[in-house]
Amino acid sequence: MDYIETFINPQVIFLYNENKKIIKTIFLSKDSMIEDSHVMTVYNYLLSSHSDIFENKPQFINDHVILTFTLEQARGYIKNILGLSDDIILFSIWNNFDYYLKNGIFDPYNIQNMLLVEPNDDKSILYNIYQNIVEGAVFCVTTNKNIGSQLARSNVYSSVYRDYISEIINNIYKNRYAMKSSIIDAMEYSINIDFQDLLRISNIPDYNKTLCISAYNNFYIKGNKITILDNFDSMYESKYLKIYDKNININIYDDVLYVKKLSDFTDILNKYNIKSINIKSLKPKTTIYVYFNTFLNPNLTIEFDFDFFINDTKKTKNIFIDLTGKINIMTSQSHISYRSYNISTDLAKYFTLFILGYSHIFNKVQSKAKIKKIDELYPSRYCQNYKDIKRQPILIDHIDESRLIKISDNFYTGKEDSTKTYQRKGTKKVYDPLKHGDVYIDSNGLKYQCSSIYYSNMGFLGNIYSATGICYPCCYSKPKIRDTIFNTCVHGTKFIHEEKINPIIVNYGRLILNPSNLSNLPYKLNLLLNSKNQIRIVKHTNRIILAKNYTVIMAYQPSTIIKDFNEMYNFIIENNAILFNDNMMYTHKDIIENNNITPSIFILIQNRIHQFKNINKEQDNDNITVSIVDSNKINLIKNKFSVLNNITKEISENGITVKNGKCYIDGELVKNKNITYFTKFSNITIRPKSISEYILKYFKKYIDDNIYTDNYFLFNKIFVTNILNIMHENDAILNDFSVIQKKLDDMSSDYIVTQSKTYN
């Protein structure tokens, strides 16, 4: 998806005097943005057509009248920019602001009939009064003294407006956000059976029973009113709404028309099952998706004094509604969606700019998101919040060094705050100084801080570090400064795994990521390999007291994940491995048959490789010794699990030959990794910015010109799946499709060459 750099369009303010001359012109934007803007075109037009209208040269201010202002807020903001003390009148050249003139543009210097002038509501939102205002607002301003009337209106202003807007627009220019939009139209109407609507519809006077209702364009039903939006025209009679009762009597007197065939409507549903039918949404709701090239924390928090922008919905953190109550806004990490009957892409992008600008300052928009998954491991599972216990650190935007002590370049420990709380312990009050949360800065520059006063000491997850070498913070009740992983992550000291084995053995099924930890074998393998070996453990604690040549599961280093059959096959070949997974043994016949190879035994747990080892421990000694699985146990495995022998007698039929355990087709050797042939296709979901969507767009003309089917959705999924398989790609979300395009171009050119050879 191609992103386009997007900015706020410049605005202009014209201040008029009593002679209708413009005594002050203020452009609101950066200088570099104004030259090719809509408002500069307006300025040049006035300059060329009324050369004497401007009495002074224009000024340039990096400011903005936010279009979510109400009229009274806009007057207050503009009045403050101009530095006026008197109330003002807000009007414009091509649209109406403070006052509305029917079939015309309100001009306070030329009012011919005051009866035709109506004031707009002070609570009206700017973008709702004038829909194209996003392109560049032109604000004309004057006062009562200049026009000799009392049309000026009061205003609302707070310095908070200026502070917020100034910081947000500076952030927008600084970050140079790039966007891309897509539009989806909803269905024109939907039909619902709803018992509650029966009373409203059947309460129409003298209208005893609703048989059925059918609708075409230009109609809607609300309560017991039927409205036709266009004036009646007999030429379009067949398009109108028709309602009948049993006697073909119509007792609705407003906009009701007629029909010749009652069955046209009664056949839709069985009349005995009809309770009521409610037709919704005459005009389709439009959903606009605006994608951007940064990361947004979708859980926005709108400050209480920033109430001139959008409203939150209290219950859901990422769903908002605009100030008119007509636009639903849903935020996500990579895009924002807007759903309304009447919204333009320009307005959606305008909202997006301000949401990103606001969030970057107040909601910590980061260039990278907080890590959720590392090598198929979820840190949140090892560092869990529970009710009031907040162990997961939060992301912060800046570091308050007045509350922290710098320990290293990437770590700050919190100071104790002795001014706060007392805590009861029995009947005695105990002084309890609180500690500000520790702060850690990771390699991506993300700043993590412990947010709980009783879990304010930061440490690092041992399992995550052992498996991946990544320092992932978690909050603890006690300091971790003596922990070896802590010293590695904070001070850069070399981490050395403890050679001493942990005597606690866990049940099979849990991931073993630390090289010093142990796990039991699966039940059947344990019976096979350990039936003649001895182990004694303490009940309830699973602590090993004694072990003699006992086979267990241990972590494998380097930590390895197996995602598909190819990776499993390669691992087996490279490591001379016998690999267990889901009660199945996987290996290669050469590993089984070659007596000079000593295979290693592995098992997959949650797609991660673990190894089998033998352990020994004396009862009067705490040390546990580890050794490889002995040959006797390996032979037990070989004998227990059957392996297909080579086919010695040659078989040949229809061009296919099997000899010496190998398959030939027309004399050519087939190189296969397994005797089982299978093709695995991943499910695709044709989403915006996905490879599957890009493929459909690439072949759109071909499909439109050549494919005819009743189910395009099914065809598209099959078509895209095959293309992905040919390209050896999986469906994914991308920002850059240059590699995919090259593959498709090469594929298309190969097809053209092949076809030309065929026809020649």
Curated annotation (Swiss-Prot):
Keyword Transcription: yes
Annotated keywords: Activator, DNA-binding, Transcription, Transcription regulation, Virion
GO MF terms, alphabetically ordered: DNA binding
Top-rank taxon: Viruses
Protein's GO biological process: positive regulation of DNA-templated transcription
Cell compartment(s), UniProt: Virion
CC per GO annotation: virion component
Quaternary data: Heterodimer of a 70 kDa and a 82 kDa subunit. Part of the early transcription complex composed of ETF, RAP94, and the DNA-directed RNA polymerase.
Functional description taken from the UniProt entry: Acts with RNA polymerase to initiate transcription from early gene promoters. Is recruited by the RPO-associated protein of 94 kDa (RAP94) to form the early transcription complex, which also contains the core RNA polymerase. ETF heterodimer binds to early gene promoters.
Family of the protein in this entry: Belongs to the poxviridae VETF large subunit family.
Protein name (record): Early transcription factor 82 kDa subunit
